[in-house]
Design a protein with these regions (language model features):
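Short beta-strand-loop/turn "lid" adjacent to the catalytic site in phosphate-handling enzymes
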Residues: 1-3
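Glycine-/charge-enriched secondary-structure boundary and capping motifs
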Residues: 5-28, 35-51, 62, 122, ...
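A cross-domain feature marking catalytic cores of carbohydrate-active enzymes
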Residues: 33-34, 55
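Active-site glycine-rich loop that binds ribose-phosphate moieties when present
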Residues: 52-66, 100-123
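Acidic/histidine-enriched ion/cofactor-binding microenvironments in catalytic or ligand-binding pockets
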Residues: 57-83
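Glycine- and other small-residue-rich loops at beta-strand/loop junctions that grip anionic moieties
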Residues: 69, 80-81, 105-109, 134-140, ...
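Short, Lys/Arg- and Gly-enriched loop/turn segments at beta-strand edges
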Residues: 84-91
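Gly-rich Lys/Arg/Thr-decorated short loops/hinges at beta-loop-alpha junctions or inter-strand turns
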Residues: 93-99
Length: 206
């Protein structure tokens, strides 16, 4: 549906954008595949482009990496950005979100977490013998409760192998950062698609 020249230009711009983000993270794009959609694209054509990345790397054996497991008793949870995007987008589909709230969410979602990682690494470099992070994960498709449950499952497998008591997580709701407007939208009855599964995950969390 698009001319070869336009396809090449769009692909070039996409790759430039991806590389500009990867360079900041110290990563390189080393390959990939392209597929042409069967759907007739709508203008602007750039909005019809979908891209995804698979990340692979090699760890220096002198360094430790942040895995999902490894939580320790007494650990505190660091949440690097507010929660509630699922609720906000559910309300957005019903035209119930104020523009400034949506703008702030999109701006935050586009912000790299690189500065936070650098800050933690700096703390580690100051005291190399202190392990600042015991476990780490992203909060994406399974929400906060889903990912915490995964971390608990991974951690407690190791706990049982060492004949230690399984850990539980205590969440202080007032200390969990959420986007502006989320609590009001909850009161109006909006919920994310994860709400039913979150009720199941609550069994592992106090």
């Amino acid at each position: 549906y698009l001319t070869n020249n336009l396809q090449q230009e769009l692909l070039f711009q996409v790759l430039e954008g991806i590389n500009s983000a990867l360079t900041i993270q110290g990563a390189k794009l080393i390959g990939g595949h392209t597929l042409e959609s069967r759907k007739i694209p709508e203008e602007p054509f750039a909005l019809g482009i979908e891209s995804s990345l698979t990340v692979n790397g090699i760890i220096d054996n002198k360094k430790y990496f942040w895995s999902k497991g490894g939580m320790k008793k007494g650990d505190q949870i660091l949440i690097s950005r507010p929660l509630g995007t699922g609720i906000i987008f559910a309300a957005f589909m019903n035209s119930k979100v104020k523009p400034y709230i949506l703008d702030s969410v999109l701006k935050e979602m586009n912000k790299s977490q690189h500065d936070i990682v650098n800050y933690i690494n700096q703390l580690t470099n100051i005291n190399p013998h202190s392990k600042i992070v015991n476990a780490c994960t992203d909060i994406t498709g399974f929400g906060l409760l889903g990912h915490l449950s995964e971390m608990l499952e991974s951690t407690n497998r190791d706990q049982l192998k060492m004949n230690l008591e399984p850990l539980k997580i205590i969440l202080e709701m007032d200390n969990i950062p959420v986007y502006d407007g989320v609590k009001e939208l909850l009161d109006q009855g909006f919920e994310s698609t994860l709400a039913p599964s979150n009720e199941i995950f609550l069994q592992n969390i106090d």
